[in-house]
Amino acid sequence: MKLGVILPTFRDTVDDALEVARRCEEQGLDGVFAYDHLWPMGSPTRPSFAPFPVLAAAAARCPSLHVGPLVARVGMVGPAHLIDQFRSLASIAPGRVVAALGTGDVKSRDELEGYGLAVTSADQRRSEMELIARALRDDMPVWIGAGAEATNELARQLDVTLNVWDLDADRLTALTALGPVTWAGPVRENLPGLLDELRNAGVQWAVLAPGVDVAALAHWRDRGGC
């Protein structure tokens, strides 16, 4: 199981994010990721860095790390633009980009409307996500954020990876029986126990939210966790 960390991008500067990326590479972790939010959920006055520039900077500084948004939300920009963003990032980090995609949900509405963006239907967003995934899947790993059953089924039809947020071990095991799954979620008090559960459920990646102890992740790996 590969280990990744979501960078802290709800900040006034990118310094913290790049420092976390440096520590991840120093500890031999596998990748870093970044949220794709116009502002932190429910906090429109707080800063939020766009994921692709931060990931490009991290990739240029840390050549061993995989990088990707978690997840790039379909519908905020046109499909062709989003495809170009992934390909531009891949030109900086060839072979190291994860194209993680999501359709968003009702919680995304305030952000989109706050920036004057249209809120399209879930069916339209899924259609655009399929177009993007088909365009990229031969060049880089594609993850689709789990959600509605129609979205989960699309991931299986496309033979790409399903990415889940903070799902428990029992439901994970059921999903991994159907196809590849990656997990992302918040840090828990018993980090080694969480990682053991994810590994035993057959998860391919565990990606921890900002604030995780990077050294503790490396320690779990070094004692044979992966």
At which residue positions do the language-model features occur?
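Active-site-adjacent structural elements that line small-molecule/cofactor binding pockets in enzymes
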Residues: 1-226
